[in-house]
């Protein structure tokens, strides 16, 4: 978004690989050769001198071990002759997608002063710690990521390439446990699981005819076990995954056997008669699950988790709840597990629990948490429609809009009929008739005789249809549709609602699941007791024993950092208490400037005098907080209708510019007053301001205007300040250069996230966002970029890319590259360290994301300058997990905050964490409502060799620098900002589809450039519209 920057292949002022500067006598930066990654300096010293990245890298902990490349014959024929890794070659030119993929090189040491001689990095010896299939997959994916660099705009392109290699993945080992902070004990919702002492056997299952439904497959297997458990199965009680695998505790009496099982046909929802159907089931021995490897892994003597053994144990413990409850993902729901609550529009909540077996330092643990989700209420269809439309439709026909809404809501839903006595046939709704019931007829014989639906129901069932002006439900297939009047149908119980909830439903669901810590802990314990794992026949069969006590875990409470404010304030710094502080007697460390501003009021119930008074008080608060803020607007406040938002904003903007233009001034800020329920207005306003007008804006809801206390005004001032380029606070330790591995040499901190469309929006792209710090050593101000990419794709495509200009040839680009250049422009320094916080990655995607995104970071760095390889630490941030931490004693006021949650700064890096890898749970925020969810940080790559204390303290301290409030936040700010940026970008593409401004309010986007990617099927993803240059480099997304 925003016009693309001119091509800047290097950190220098122009595109030539030259340097200058005063020292060293050489002319320019030196020669860049793609030979063994060596840099041959022609001179150094001075500000334009040679690169200062040299020497063999310190071996990153764990790490991806690089082998010297040895091409196979076929590969050599395809790729051409390659030189050994450390030999010299002449410069070569590679262009286009057939170029050779670069290595994921380990970073080289990067001292401030350039050396006289630079040596090439040495390849480390290979290790073989991953399964062969993973290594092959990694290599294949790396080869698919082939790309080349353009380092210069000159006629002779200097292109660096690094050869492909095989590699063995090994995430960093834990560098010991942390020691900083006050030690304490907390309880975690993990329950120790004792490993079985039995041999686990796996059998392949083949069912003919083939079944796609897990429910039907389980029904077949349940019947087989019922008939043959004590005979052919040798008394074994097997666990079945619902697809192709069966597991037993010990061998079956055969290696392969075929069974014939007869069941009533599955109810397909068409209403046809169900008949007996016979299935052939073949059970064949496949393998033994190796529990010894699992024991070795849990003891820390093996790096690779034996997923097969963990999967078997997980399936065993899921077998009974799957039979009892409605399973969805790793959760189970039932109306018997807690009270139901209506969500409105025909939906209700079902309570349930989440269950997952996990390898941890204390051994195997079963993670149990409370859960809730939305189900259809088992209502008569007419009652459902009345709730859906929020109006009684029993006395009038439906409008076309109402018909469309009903059809969309009911398509695919199962209903039972009520007009046939005890015969409750079930049908699946495929549509809605366009005609009213009284107008519907159907043929009854081949002679062309027709009968009305009303007449048929009267004659056949003795049922008089009352609401004949309503349409019928259409059930069955399109070739032979059946018509059912709404009044004879009732929604079948137990159908989960998988579409997008509206804001009121989301709010009601959150209220239902929001529990104080003590209550949630009690419910979890009760759920474990209710599940009676000690009586579970499958757990007993396999010898698995589950503790009924929450894990007691050692934790530490990290101290809050001291925050720096402006010297002109009465308080020049402060120490937060329990994760909170305020702006009283303080001034922003760098106040922004707002010399010209306007206000547009879209809230009908806010009078002009009230709007003007609110803006005046807000301007005074901004001034008092340290901003250079004009007290009077350029033009008086103006009311505009929400449906005229574009016309009103553009007209008012041009009126203001007619005044400011002759004075050579720009409009700095728009204040928008919005109704509390503003629909798509918020997103429309942001899109128009940032895309069309190049103007930052601050939206305020009606309730804020009427409440207008100092806290509200102070929070708005914080947001406005960073939107116009100011900084609210910085860490005292950053200013005094006391943050290990951050302030000792130029460091850039990235945050990245991908947001996906809501369920049902199959054509919408996913939005990737990357932000990066633009100040050093303070690391407080962030710029951001966003990119549209293929639907529901988690890997970020546009971290590094090459576009092909017909006149200039290949041009390097990408979000990481542009943010590195922006950092150099802002600070005058080249980053020598990269700390990359990646949000939203599940454990199953760790390898894939690291492979793709670390590779892109490496390419982006190498495209800027030969041998430019800053040391990278790559950390995944996870919030969508189910680990909860509780105070050991809820009545101890010194160990809980006001909400009853554990204190901010509580960190856990033992017992419930990974057996060997570098991860930790950090609760960095004070609870407000409900039970706090700690963030989980997992280090996937670490060339900076962080200690546990250094990374935990850095992460916790950064959580106090979030720009929008005077509270520490729950995840590290760069990841938070990336999340906001991705959501803001969706407004630019979906300005008409937002259901509610309340969801949108406060979510923003990053400084960004218009980007386009290709979908997996080859279709172009619609590019994001361009952001104006005047808002690109400020934190307007706050």
Swiss-Prot record:
The keyword Cell inner membrane does not apply. GO terms for biological process: regulatory ncRNA-mediated gene silencing. SMART domains: DUF1785 (SM01163), PAZ (SM00949), Piwi (SM00950). Residues 18-29, 43-52 have a biased composition (Gly residues). One of its GO terms (cellular component) is nucleus. Belongs to the argonaute family. Ago subfamily. This is Protein argonaute 1D. The gene is AGO1D.
